[in-house]
């Protein structure tokens, strides 16, 4: 009976997952594999697999998202650690509220504010005050992603450091570790789960972002994955083939992402499991 009550508490979550994730993904997969208007699956996927634009867009989004994650992690990790060591709870709450403030406001308002600030700074530097189209290049897209998605790295890390037992640090110092060694050998391993959570919260939105590149990069070369799929989706209103190609682009990007996730997360576990089995087998035979 107790077990059934636990399952009942999970019902709303699974219902929402089915409605907002499983059903849309199923529709995307079916749409991507259907023959639209007499076009075969080969004709639908050939511009994606054989074309340069898709993989160029995916590569651009991949390196941009990777740099965003690295910068966010380098900024958030020491900041959250030293903030969690403060004994003043009011100060900690105030600072973390300021650090995560961009999450509270509208996405569009944040983009407008950042674009205005960048145009003002560039206008003063180039003596072109009043010109609202001075942000050219993917560097401004990267600045926007770092600004918008870094707060998502703060929350899991800060919560993790707040529950970090101080006894671990004291024990490492008793063993002769200095604070740098304790940080590397104690704090970072303890924060592994929080780091992975922060990376997921930062990486995937950066990888699939649409509006940031369109809004901040005026070079008309904002060929990110999100913009590529968005363009195909817009053309899909008039062309079923383009709509199918958009679905195909999402499927290919998802497969590449899941393959990368498998290599990073599950492959090391499988290797360790195989090594453990081999060691046990050798011990039994010896």
Swiss-Prot record:
Signal peptide: none annotated. Coiled coil: none annotated. The keyword Nucleotide-binding does not apply. InterPro entries: MetI-like (IPR000515), MetI-like_sf (IPR035906). Keywords: Cell membrane, Membrane, Transmembrane, Transmembrane helix, Transport. It comes from the Bacteria. The chain crosses the membrane at residues 10-30, 62-82, 94-114, 136-156, 193-213, 248-268. It is a multi-pass membrane protein. The keyword Cell membrane applies. It is found in: Cell membrane. Belongs to the binding-protein-dependent transport system permease family. CysTW subfamily. This is Spermidine/putrescine transport system permease protein PotB homolog. The gene is potB.
